[in-house]
């Protein structure tokens, strides 16, 4: 492709909303333009990157028996109502909802578990057809409250989603392992640093679940890693530091604490460390339009993990109650809630079990108690694991070795769903006894745009984008000084030769200085530059420089040999951009 014909434009200034590097560079380099908040138009440059990314995905999924399908973006509410997810998604206000001319409720697809389950239910006639692995690569929609970070959190985005149906839990696990390995190969081909971590399934399902995270400083997710084991901080099992508490139980005392509401204030007021203070938080659950409130006690030096609390309470999710809700239901202000005389069900984290003579609130404004003890002053509660893991906590899955904490961008998520969806849609087969058996389902997804944005966050430098060779829009840029007629003639000849052989050259034929062209090539993230400079006239050698700065010289006669060893050939995979006369 000639740059003079390419539909693109670089920009010195990014959109004011470009708060992250990936969004800023994609705009500056002319890869995308903002259509509306969270909605973007892609230029031919970015479309080529996406085509290469999706080609890698197809190759790896086809290699394990995946079959590509196309599922509808417009989905009837009645399918979602069968699984109970219509109300759940509506409550989060993330669905794009509309009605057809018959007044039937529809949504724009955020995911396809319901649709594919109904699809397979119509097709499946016997056990011998299993396992089956269907996948698609298409657009998804989420009405994000705060779309931000460019492709990291958009309202419209591209995803690969796979669905497997099996005849048994064992076969489901086999399919899970195959997809997991295929996803690893996909990210390995991008040369990304990533980790696979245990995760919570959220609203999709409560079975086995893992996330793939690309490590980068921007990462919205906190990842706990110990040796080869990793987990999202919300799912990480951890052993926090333990402390020795008093064995001599002291008489409980009420202490006036005017306007002393926070753990930090209590630490100073009582001159005692945080781990000797009991912190009580009120959480709210909402199941079948019924709100319930619970008190959760944790050590004062730790943070609550609402995902673990929801799992303990056997609900889909929960949230911290607002100050208004606390005042309405407990008749006490936030900051003075405690397990003493608590009017709602109360549970405590395991790390609070050995605490003695601790400080806590007693549900009276401006009053706390000290020397409080379980069993004597407060009935012994049910205990559970309610803590967020932290750096230095010990990992039970890695022999008690400590966790390290990293930031990551979630780029893929894999789930074992069991029979949650297949039961709702009666997806099954008859066994040898004539009894109906349900299929066991798995769901898997890669965020294509998020993965490419994560590539940028991890690999970009102060010059611009740095695309992995596997997905770069062009492999090599041919550069010469504008106005150099001999250099232009050589460049055109080399361009035609490389183009014929399928090596995807980009010819910068603009009438610009060589230095200007070099900077643009770096900004675009093209892996290699083929430079026809002053030295070519004296030595007859071409200079090749990689995006990382490594240089070598080759003769025009040996250029194709160098390309065959260093560049991918995309003669059949990616259609060339059409050129004009």
Curated annotation (Swiss-Prot):
Show the GO MF annotations.
aminoacyl-tRNA deacylase activity; ATP binding; proline-tRNA ligase activity
Q: GO cellular component annotations, sorted alphabetically?
A: cytosol
**Gene Ontology terms describing biological process:** prolyl-tRNA aminoacylation
Q: Where in the cell is it found?
A: Cytoplasm
Instruction: Name the EC number(s).
Output: 6.1.1.15
CDD domains reported for this sequence: ProRS-INS (cd04334), ProRS_anticodon_short (cd00861), ProRS_core_prok (cd00779)
Keyword Cell membrane in the entry? The reply is no
PROSITE patterns in alphabetical order: AA_TRNA_LIGASE_II
Keywords, in A-Z order = Aminoacyl-tRNA synthetase, ATP-binding, Cytoplasm, Ligase, Nucleotide-binding, Protein biosynthesis
The chemistry this enzyme catalyses reads: tRNA(Pro) + L-proline + ATP = L-prolyl-tRNA(Pro) + AMP + diphosphate
Pfam families reported for this sequence: HGTP_anticodon, tRNA-synt_2b, tRNA_edit
Look up the domain of life of the source. Answer: Bacteria
Please verify whether the record's keywords include Cytoplasm: yes
Question: What does the entry's domain section say?
Answer: Consists of three domains: the N-terminal catalytic domain, the editing domain and the C-terminal anticodon-binding domain.
Per its UniProt record, what HAMAP family does this chain match?
Pro_tRNA_synth_type1
Which protein family is it in?
A: Belongs to the class-II aminoacyl-tRNA synthetase family. ProS type 1 subfamily.
What job does this protein perform? Answer: Catalyzes the attachment of proline to tRNA(Pro) in a two-step reaction: proline is first activated by ATP to form Pro-AMP and then transferred to the acceptor end of tRNA(Pro). As ProRS can inadvertently accommodate and process non-cognate amino acids such as alanine and cysteine, to avoid such errors it has two additional distinct editing activities against alanine. One activity is designated as 'pretransfer' editing and involves the tRNA(Pro)-independent hydrolysis of activated Ala-AMP.
- PANTHER family listed in its UniProt record: MITOCHONDRIAL RIBOSOME PROTEIN L39/PROLYL-TRNA LIGASE FAMILY MEMBER, PROLINE--TRNA LIGASE
Quaternary state and partners of this protein? Homodimer.
What is the name of the protein in this document? Proline--tRNA ligase
Q: Which organism is it from?
A: Chlamydia trachomatis serovar D (strain ATCC VR-885 / DSM 19411 / UW-3/Cx)
What gene is it encoded by?
A: proS
């Amino acid at each position: 492709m000639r740059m003079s014909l390419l539909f693109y434009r670089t920009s010195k200034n990014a959109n004011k909303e470009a708060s992250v590097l990936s969004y800023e560079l994609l705009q500056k380099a002319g890869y995308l333009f903002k259509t509306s908040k969270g909605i973007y138009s892609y230029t031919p440059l970015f479309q080529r990157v996406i085509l290469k990314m999706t080609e890698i995905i197809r190759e790896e999924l086809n290699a394990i028996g995946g079959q590509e399908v196309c599922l509808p973006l417009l989905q009837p509410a009645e399918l979602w109502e069968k699984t109970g997810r219509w109300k759940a998604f509506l409550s989060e206000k993330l669905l794009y909802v509309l009605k057809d001319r018959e007044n039937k409720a529809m949504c724009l697809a955020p995911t396809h578990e319901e649709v594919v389950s109904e699809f397979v239910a119509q097709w499946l006639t016997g056990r011998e057809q299993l396992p089956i692995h269907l996948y698609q690569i298409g657009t998804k929609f989420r009405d994000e409250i705060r779309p931000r970070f460019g492709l990291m959190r958009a309202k419209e985005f591209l995803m690969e989603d796979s669905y497997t149906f099996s005849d048994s839990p064992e076969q489901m696990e086999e399919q899970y392992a195959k997809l997991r390995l295929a996803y690893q190969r996909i990210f390995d081909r991008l040369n990304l640093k990533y980790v696979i971590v245990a995760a919570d399934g959220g609203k999709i399902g409560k079975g086995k679940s893992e996330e793939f995270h690309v490590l980068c400083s921007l990462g919205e997710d906190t990842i706990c890693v110990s040796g080869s084991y990793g987990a999202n901080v919300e799912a990480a099992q951890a052993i926090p530091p333990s402390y020795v508490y008093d064995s001599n139980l002291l008489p409980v005392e009420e202490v006036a604490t005017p306007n002393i509401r926070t753990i930090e204030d209590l630490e100073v007021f009582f001159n005692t460390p945080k781990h000797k203070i009991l912190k009580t938080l009120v959480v709210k659950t909402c199941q079948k339009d019924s709100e319930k409130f619970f008190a959760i006690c944790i050590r004062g030096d730790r943070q609550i993990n609402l995902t673990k609390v929801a799992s303990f309470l056997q609900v889909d999710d929960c949230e911290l109650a607002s100050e208004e809700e606390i005042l309405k239901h407990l008749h006490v202000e936030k900051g003075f809630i405690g397990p003493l005389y608590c009017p709602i069900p109360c549970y405590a984290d395991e790390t609070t079990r050995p605490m003695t003579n601790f400080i806590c609130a007693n549900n009276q404004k401006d009053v706390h108690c000290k020397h409080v003890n379980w069993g004597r002053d407060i009935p012994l509660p049910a205990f559970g694991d309610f803590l967020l893991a932290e750096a230095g906590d010990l990992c039970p899955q890695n022999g008690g070795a400590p966790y390290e904490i990293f930031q990551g961008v979630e780029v893929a998520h894999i789930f074992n769903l069991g029979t949650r969806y297949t039961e709702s849609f009666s997806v099954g087969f008859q066994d040898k006894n004539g009894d109906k058996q349900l299929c066991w389902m798995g769901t898997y997804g890669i965020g294509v745009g998020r993965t490419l944005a994560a590539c940028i966050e991890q690999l970009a430098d102060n010059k611009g984008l740095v695309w992995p060779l596997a997905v770069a829009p062009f492999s090599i840029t041919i550069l010469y000084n504008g106005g150099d007629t001999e250099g232009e003639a050589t460049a055109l000849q080399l361009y035609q030769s490389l183009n014929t052989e399928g090596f995807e050259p980009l010819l910068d034929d603009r009438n610009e200085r060589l230095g200007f062209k070099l900077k643009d090539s770096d900004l675009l993230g093209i892996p290699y530059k083929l430079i026809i400079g002053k030295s070519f006239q004296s030595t007859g050698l071409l200079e090749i420089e990689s995006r990382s700065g490594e240089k070598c010289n080759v003769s025009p006669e040996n250029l194709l040999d160098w390309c065959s060893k260093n560049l991918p050939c995309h003669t059949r995979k990616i259609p060339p951009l059409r050129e004009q006369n």
